[in-house]
Amino acid sequence: PPMTPAMPHGLNLSGEEAASKRARLAEGLKARGARAAIITLADSVCWLHNIRGSDLPHTPFVLGFAILYSDASSELFLDDAKHSPELIAHLVDGVRLRAPEEFVAALDALAGHAVLADPASAAHAVFDRLSKQKARILRAPDPCQLPKACKNAVEIEGMRQAHIRDGAALTRFLAWFAGAAAQGGLTEIDAAQKLEGFRRATGCLS
């Protein structure tokens, strides 16, 4: 599996501290009577903890799992190879780093509790394990997805700047394409590679 270091996603980019996000979502868990929520989607894990990585091409995610608790604490399950010094310094009180091998034991510790899990994203093994431990499973959407979609002012500005950079790269590509296509012999792969090259030149494409 990919083993790139996890890095902080700064407040200047996220617009909200990770602790604030956890606290907001924890209130929702308490309102539902849930002890915890199982977070398995990479984008949710990264958004909730304000971290990023390079485990996937062109997508700044680090692959792992998390459990968010109703007291606003969380457990983040990442391989040791992903524990960069920057990550350690970034994660403050309330977040416990654990090995992926400990995920099953963490599920077992929720025996008898109400636990939220998303059937659209969590693996069957998660539901099977919780069921065996007599947990009360609340099947509901990943609690990160809706808040993550509601962008704050900092995120909106970041999106605007990203579109400006990408728009400039696309404009350069179209200018090149107008000449290259007229000469003939151009393939879709040629065009795709050239466009990626213009986008890489922005310095913002992993």
Task: State where each predicted segment sits.
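Active-site neighborhoods and metal-handling regions in enzymes and metal-associated proteins
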Residues: 1-206
